[in-house]
Amino acid sequence: MNKPTPAIVSQDAARRLPRWALLLFCLAYAVPGLVGRAPWKSADLASFGYMLEMARGQTSWMDPRLLGLRPEADGLLPYWLGAAAIRLGDGWLAPAMAARLPFFVLLGLAMAATWYAVYLLARKPQAQPVAFAFGGEARPSDYARAIADGGLLALIACLGLAQLAHEITTSVAQLAFTALAFYGAAGIGRRRWWPEIGLLLGLAGLALSGAPTISAFLGAGAAVLHVLATARPWRKGDWRVLGIIALATLLAILLSSSMDLWRWRILLPQDAGSKDWRTILRLLVWFTWPAWPLVMWSLWRWRLQVWSRTPSLHVALPLWFMLVTLVAALTTKPADRALLLALPAMATVAAFALPTLTRSVAALIDWFTLLFFTGCGAIIWIIWIAMQTGYPRQGASNVQRQAPDFVASFSLPVFLVALVATLVWGWLVHWRVGRHRAAIWKSMVLPAGGAALCWLLLMSLWMPLLDYVRSYSVVVRNVMAIAHPAQCIQQWGLSREQVAAFAYHGGYRISQATPDQLECPWLVVNPEALAGLQVQASAGQWQLLATLRRPSDKGDDVMLLRRTSP
């Protein structure tokens, strides 16, 4: 028996967002940040370093190393994808751009899988809106498309998605495969086999991307929920569903075991202080904004469908995916990369809040979003004008303080792109304040549009500045001005990303210095490891030529030393 539904939706409110507009919207969000920039500190650059070494044949594809160091993130599949793209693009595409192409596809896969997952869940009988006495309620397919549009917009609106989803790390692969597994679990049992294939690839890909435990828990929980959500769980068709989910989960577990992917990374509660918990709480608030208030609202309005003997899958399934990834974020580090995996499920739960919102709540969302993103966009423009003209003086001085040697440049195409994006935002605001728009996804238009606008402005107007302060190109150029890349050079205590930066930006083949092998005339040293070097080698053998500092980061110095005696 279906529980009373809180959704009251007319056919007029179930209008769908035009496909071309939704596609352009996704492209406007996904493309900026993937093109026109150097690899950034730290995980983005470190991952690229391993991919570059693999593509050049400098390390094994089954056990990649960077000067003897294994990757911090487990899972080989993302590195394989990036390295294969670099090798295929050799000669006609820059390595950094080639490595980003598979991750651009993965981001698009995450968006598409989220849309289809929401659509399939919204088609379920328990998710349908109230039937009107004299007709006029939304048709099931139109209602599901409108909810799916809202879910995708809610995903894009999440503030934490922007930077991490545009990197070339295992986190992006985990996000895509989590969304793919979510789609498979949402649609399994239909006549077509696409959801089953999606579930199998999603759980296996998630395990191969370094999250085998999450993969196992998601698969097991999906199987249990499908049993609990069925009034007669032991029919032939339900046995088939349970068997497919169990098989996909078992294959992911066996794959993880065969490749030795299981790692214990859990931080027990006594390992984290009160300050860490406060930090995590702040991360949850801003990272998942604006989805989390809608999630709370949705869980309250749909509580009868969740807390019952036969829970409704359209809320219970995304809730399980959300809880598993939230627990992973609370018990592992870095928390933000684990929290990224919760966003597709949170966006789904938030989407089911849209048909239950009152006018006052919808208006509050619109006005807060309008003020917040308009203010953010204005600040980005003001700082850019200050970089170009020196006025306002306060903005120019702030930039000069953070990047003392940065010289701004003007690009007409970049300016026009940013200007068009700002004008589109103005049109979007004008459209939204119109009283004639009744679509249920309308409350997500401004949050998603504002997030896309600010990200696009940052990745266009501020790109030269961000490249200057977030990449190691400046440090490498300063070293190249003293030590030519063709000369023998060793390193002592550098991080993975620093080694990768010297290999990519300078073409250096830096070797690892050891106490009994300090034969090169040049030595690049991490200042924190200098004391250890002085213990192993005579201080009089080396002359400090320069201490090179990465802009905006005083704790990321590099020291260049030259041998003075054999």
Functional labels for PLM-detected ranges:
Residues 3-23, 171, 187-566:
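Membrane-embedded architecture of ER/inner-membrane glycosylation machinery
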Residues 27-61, 262-271:
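Aromatic-rich transmembrane-lumenal/periplasmic boundary elements in polytopic membrane proteins
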Residues 135-154, 462:
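Intrinsically disordered, low-complexity acidic Ser/Thr-rich regulatory segments
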Residues 76, 80, 89-117, 141-149, ...:
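Loop-to-helix entry region of an early transmembrane alpha helix in multi-pass inner-membrane enzymes
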Residues 101-139, 156-157, 180:
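Transmembrane-helix motifs of polytopic, lipid-linked glycan transferases
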Residues 114-117, 161, 181, 295, ...:
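Hydrophobic/aromatic residues in alpha-helical transmembrane segments
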Residues 47-73, 77, 84-87:
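Extracytosolic helix-loop segments that constitute the early lumenal/periplasmic catalytic or substrate-binding loops
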Residues 160-173, 212-214:
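Short acidic/glycine- and proline-prone juxtamembrane loop motifs at membrane-interface regions
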